[in-house]
Amino acid sequence: GAHDVVDNFVCFGTDTKPCPDDNLYRIIGVFGDKVKLIKYDYATKELLGEDGDYIKLYTERNDNTSNYYENNLVKIAAYAWNYKKDMSINNGYGSNTWSTSLLNKINLNTNFINNIGTNWIDKIIETTWKVGGNIHVNIETQPAKVAYQNEIVNPVMTYSTDNQTEYNAKIGLMYVSDYMYAALQDKWILAGSIYNDASKDYRSATSVNWLYMGLVEWTISRCANNENYVFYVNYGGQVNATNANNYLAIRPAFYLSNSVSYLSGSGTKTDPIILGD
């Protein structure tokens, strides 16, 4: 549904009231018995650090930021998907193997965990992330249902350096299919991207896709056409692929432990859900 209309806001990482914007998360969905959250706004270097795959502040991309929904632009950090570990691999374009990514291992699964605090990290469970991805025509140019099948159910290991389609960790990023399913249901027939027709892809769904935030951001999914392409959402709202050394915005995603309970809140941005132990 539309950006602020879906009442799926959760306050996470603080007991401060009212909940600071930087602690707002949103419920992507319930998968089996696991609730999946994603950070509402893009991560800062204070949250994810200036080591790992940090490149620079997002404003230094000199990108189109006119679609950005919030007012925190100057603090948003931009990270490569997998570049700093080996800056010469694949002619310097980075690698699309998630298990070797410092964004994964340092920024998300070390710094985020340390900065969010023990009490809150205990509310997050380790999960199996589907990281094989698939080739361009099986995800980017497909509607949500087909993209989900090719991304989550039948990922591939083509061109990966570890021949794995799964990675176990607490923190990850959204899937392409998460983004696509966040739009109103009648938009699920759209392709992630159709090169010359915005009316047939997710550019025409931004006003009714609550996951769309207006900046260029990474997903967790490889584009398995080569060793260095990764799927991302661009500022116009469509799904594309780019080199893993590119530096984009980040929104950490994770699954809550079954022991976490609902305390209060209606789920609106101003009255987010408060969690208990």
PLM segments and residue spans:
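Long, domain-scale functional regions
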Residues: 1-277
